[in-house]
C-alpha cells in the first residue's frame, strides 16, 4: 500500500463525509453524492491518493443512488474484502493503492462484466478528460 496521509492530515483536508466514507468504511446517503449524475468524459480517481479507479465509459445509472461502474481501470486498482457487516454478505471495494474504502461490488451489473461497482461519491475525485477540471465527490 502506498503511504497515505495521517488521520490528522486527512481530517484537516477532507469533509466529514469524505473522512467517514474513506477511513471509517462509511456510506453516504443514497442520491446525495456530488458525482452521481456526472456524465462528462474523464477518469474517476481515489480522493485520498489520486490513483485512477474507473473510466467514465464504464459508468452507468443503476438506480441504486450511488455512482455505478461495471469495470475498474485495472485489476490492481481495486482491492476486494469480504464484508459480513450489517447481517449481509457483500464484497467491499477499496483503493488498491492506499486502501481507502470506496463502496461494494455486486454481481447484478450490465455486460460485459455483469458487475456493479457501487461507489460513494465522497471517495472519488473526477478529472474531466477535455479540460482537466477536477471535482471532488
Curated annotation (Swiss-Prot):
Active site (catalytic residues): 118
Cofactor comment text: Binds 1 zinc ion per subunit. The zinc ion is important for the structural integrity of the protein.
Known EC number: 1.8.4.12
Cellular component aspect of the GO annotation: cytoplasm
Leader peptide range in chain numbering: none
One MF annotation (Gene Ontology) recorded for this entry: zinc ion binding
Record-linked Pfam families: SelR
GO biological process: protein repair; response to oxidative stress
The protein's name: Peptide methionine sulfoxide reductase MsrB
Higher taxonomy: Bacteria, Pseudomonadati, Pseudomonadota, Gammaproteobacteria, Enterobacterales
